[in-house]
Amino acid sequence: MTLEEIRDNAEDQERGRICHVVSPFDGTRTGISLRIVGPDSRTARNSRLQLEDELREAADKDGLVTAQGREDLVIQSLARLVLDVTADETAGQPFSLSHGNVVKLLRTSWIREQADAFAGDRRNFAPGSAR
C-alpha cells in the first residue's frame, strides 16, 4: 500500500460502511442498519480526542471516573461515529436520526457491542469495500 492509498482510504472511511444489526439470539437481521465511519477517519479521530477530554473533565480529584460515567461517555463517543440509522418494516417503527436517539439505541449492550466491533474492524473499511 502506498502512502497515497493509505491517505485515500482514511478519507474514504469518512463515508462510512453499513453495519447490519443482527439478533444476539439467532443471528438474523433485525432490520436496523447503522452507517458507521471507519477507525482511520477524521471523525473517529476527533471522537477519540473528545472522549479523552470528556474523561478528564469527568474525573474526580483523584483522577477517577465512575464506571457509569465512563460507560456513558464511551457510548456518546461511539454514537458520534454513526452517520445514519435505517430501520425497515421488520424493525417495527421508523428511526428519527439524532445523536440522542443513536445514544439510546447504543445503550442496548448487544447493539453497542456489534457497532463497536464493526467500527474497529478495518476489514470493513478495506479499499474497494464501499457499500
Region spans (language model):
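Short, surface-exposed, charged amphipathic helix/loop patches that serve as local interaction elements
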Residues: 28-131
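Extended acidic low-complexity intrinsically disordered regions
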Residues: 1-15
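Short acidic-hydrophobic surface loop/beta-edge motif
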Residues: 15-27
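Generic marker of residues within folded, mature protein domains
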Residues: 9, 24-26, 72
